[in-house]
């Protein structure tokens, strides 16, 4: 069946909810869609829709990243609901990497919690430039001073991770109260109910404080592959977010990473189940590839303009090692340590071959909380380049975050 064509009328922004488990991220996502649907700018998604598959809901926590779309007066938004549970930081990294800005949800009744800090740190490491803070569950707080105290704590936390005070903005409210108000009166409008108005006010803040990112459309095309599937009779589709550049149907691209670099032609592009003639930096798309089998390609590889990126195994990087309080290791590690390097959309094992201090001296041991220059060698080549961010992981948890400073080989 022919798909509806995607119309580009407003600037496109990738956004998401971050914050501690049970502070109301998914409920807020539902409240935003319900509120914007009043103006015809969204399809209503209720909590179960966003929370995903049954086995994820059974534990009452969000495991995957759910994507919803909506519009405001000024922008078209693709919204990811990032998982909040510490076990699923890996998904948080894949989700947060897709954000031009974030809504940090903090329960006004509880204040900042360990995952609040962890998500702020991760947002910094994956390069989320702007944060709007939603102080949720305001209906559970009787004391205005308490609300101010929570705001102050969050402000200090954001400043500690170098988020400029200008780049975040606070909006109080209650996602649940807004949803209940809309459920009891679907004809409600802006100005009719204070809780619904607070969601509108939050989205006004998002429009104002999360600027339309300057897209890297002038640069060469690159997309990290998040998932791959086959469509019978049509071929293989690679999905992901276009990191930079523009890609058109008919373009020749390279598949880079793991094995030998392959060349293929793009036969189709889709976004939100609508067909596109071309995809731009920032778009979450599915790309149909000619003559590529499901076995030729896997998550973690990249699609790129031919000759623009090559796979490497050895690099130098600037790394921050998480403290115990941030969910990192309790003990030091040494040269020769072999953790996982989480690069764009995949885990690769690598050995740490050298630590170097700021003064150039060689260090044998690194403690939680240290910032260090680190040289690493991956077990197989992946597409990496200078300035690229990555996470260091061990046994399912993030223990460090880094940025590639120099490619060796």
Swiss-Prot record:
It catalyses: GTP + H2O = GDP + phosphate + H(+). GTP binds at residues 19-26, 81-85, 136-139. It comes from the Eukaryota. Residues 19-26 are annotated as: G1. GO terms for cellular component: chloroplast; cytosol. Residues 10-214 form the tr-type G domain. Its EC number is 3.6.5.3. Coiled coil: none annotated. It is found in: Plastid, Chloroplast. Residues 81-84 are annotated as: G3. NCBIfam families: EF-Tu, PRK00049.1, PRK12735.1, PRK12736.1, small_GTP. Belongs to the TRAFAC class translation factor GTPase superfamily. Classic translation factor GTPase family. EF-Tu/EF-1A subfamily. GTP hydrolase that promotes the GTP-dependent binding of aminoacyl-tRNA to the A-site of ribosomes during protein biosynthesis. This is Elongation factor Tu, chloroplastic. It comes from Trieres chinensis (Marine centric diatom). The lineage of its organism: Eukaryota, Sar, Stramenopiles, Ochrophyta, Bacillariophyta. The gene is tufA.
